[in-house]
């Protein structure tokens, strides 16, 4: 066998392979012998059919089967012997395949890029430093109380944190518009659900009043025909309710688990949960900065085949999230996922190089610590730990996550890391 590999463009390669006629005919003869052992032809016992008749009856189909085997065998032998990092499937073109002659074919394929990390010392990472304060815990406790709150009807005027029930009809230039009308609409004030000015127009009115408010739709409003338009809403205020928060009693505290017997216990549990959420948020934020830095300093071309595979993964995940199936997933436009798929392939290649160049292996102590951390959020942590330890797929997933974290840590040792004092809210709600 002879071959030569050439670069066509980018990551695309082409290999030209020639297989000697003797090797081709030997493969055909062996396959014909195998077929002859099981061939059934009237007038002959099984396995006793003359070779000429086998050749005449099965020769053409056998040669096609042998061709497929030879293409795969010799192509992948070349790939292995030359340590080619193949991406995706090859496309074969047969140039010569005739009895008694050499087999000549070409295979076009893509390879993964050779990644050589650079610029790690130019990556900038801002690491938030956060202390969870009593005020943070108080705020979270208030959220829990609000989740358990009841609403009491009042005859007072509506305020910014009340709940109201209204009928409304909206119009632009005197004409009602689609989606601008509702009856018995329940609105919890102060949550930013409505366009600017709508809730403010309700504040100060009492149940039973009818009034009009004038507002302007934002330029960023989702409905194209309403962007930036002045609108008038006719409103009937039917009910005003005030929030009544539950008292911090032992009965209230007991709703949050068997380990919370008093307010101090509840505050401790809240602090633990906040610490766990904060830890995960910090890991995610730092990882994102490291990834962004790696991509900026190491722009790499990625094989189309790998991107297409990732697009299919993202398509199926999107379909599953919305209750769809594989057929529906295939109908989702690839453009929706192309950039994300490309980024994921790039990140995978860069992290693989970080792991390889630093000879990293998943730290089993960190694996155990991560499982224990996950289990601590459940009422029976020991059962969760046992469940993970007996599930090979889950354990491998955790090891992969830990290995990624170790790769991030390896980059951080060379990156420019600065610490910044931050609040819990700043880290958990960066867009607020």
Swiss-Prot record:
Localization (cell): Cytoplasm
Pfam families: FKBP_C (PF00254), Trigger_C (PF05698), Trigger_N (PF05697)
Disulfide bonds: none
Catalytic reaction list: [protein]-peptidylproline (omega=180) = [protein]-peptidylproline (omega=0)
One BP annotation, GO: protein transport
Documented EC number(s): 5.2.1.8
Domain comment as written in the entry: Consists of 3 domains; the N-terminus binds the ribosome, the middle domain has PPIase activity, while the C-terminus has intrinsic chaperone activity on its own.
Functional summary from the UniProt entry: Involved in protein export. Acts as a chaperone by maintaining the newly synthesized protein in an open conformation. Functions as a peptidyl-prolyl cis-trans isomerase.
Membership in a protein family: Belongs to the FKBP-type PPIase family. Tig subfamily.
Protein name: Trigger factor
Protein's organism: Histophilus somni (strain 2336) (Haemophilus somnus)
């Amino acid at each position: 066998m002879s071959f030569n590999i050439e670069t066509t463009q980018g990551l695309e390669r082409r290999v030209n392979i020639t297989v000697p006629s003797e090797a081709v005919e030997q493969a055909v003869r062996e396959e014909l012998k195998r077929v002859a052992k099981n061939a059934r032809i009237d007038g002959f016992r099984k396995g006793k059919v003359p070779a000429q008749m086998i050749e005449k009856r099965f020769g053409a189909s056998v040669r096609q089967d042998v061709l497929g085997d030879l293409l795969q065998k010799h192509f992948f032998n070349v790939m292995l012997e030359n340590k080619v990092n193949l991406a995706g499937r090859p496309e074969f073109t047969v140039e010569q395949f005739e009895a008694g002659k050499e087999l000549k074919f070409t295979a076009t394929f893509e390879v993964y890029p050779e990644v050589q990390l650079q610029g790690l010392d130019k990556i900038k990472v801002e690491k938030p430093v956060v202390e969870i304060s009593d005020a943070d815990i108080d705020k979270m406790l208030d959220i829990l109380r609000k989740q358990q709150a009841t609403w009491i009807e009042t005859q007072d005027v509506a305020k910014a944190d009340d709940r109201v029930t209204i009928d409304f009809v909206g119009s632009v230039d005197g004409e009602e518009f689609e989606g601008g009308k509702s009856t018995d609409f329940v609105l919890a004030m102060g949550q930013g659900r409505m366009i600017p000015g709508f809730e403010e127009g309700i504040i100060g009115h009492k149940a039973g009043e009818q009034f009009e408010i004038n507002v302007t739709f934002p330029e960023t409003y989702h409905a194209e025909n309403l962007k930036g338009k002045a609108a008038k809403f006719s409103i009937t205020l039917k009910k005003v309710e005030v929030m009544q928060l539950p008292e911090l009693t032992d009965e209230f505290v007991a709703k949050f688990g068997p380990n919370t017997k008093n307010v101090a216990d509840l505050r401790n549990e809240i602090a633990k949960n906040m610490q766990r959420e904060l830890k995960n948020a910090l890991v995610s934020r730092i990882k994102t900065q490291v990834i962004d830095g790696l991509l900026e300093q190491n722009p790499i071309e990625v094989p189309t085949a790998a991107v297409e595979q990732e697009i299919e993964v993202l398509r199926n995940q999107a379909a599953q999230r919305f209750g769809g199936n594989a057929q529906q997933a295939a109908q989702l436009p690839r453009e929706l996922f192309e950039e994300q798929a490309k980024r994921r392939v790039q990140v995978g290649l860069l992290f693989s190089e970080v792991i390889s160049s630093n000879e990293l292996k998943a730290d089993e102590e960190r694996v155990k610590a991560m499982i224990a951390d996950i289990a601590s959020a459940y009422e029976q942590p020991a059962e969760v730990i046992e469940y993970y330890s007996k599930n090979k797929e889950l354990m491998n997933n955790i090891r992969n996550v830990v290995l990624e974290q170790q790769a991030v840590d390896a980059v951080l040792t060379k990156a420019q890391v600065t610490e910044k004092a931050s609040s819990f809210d700043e880290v958990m709600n960066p867009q607020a």
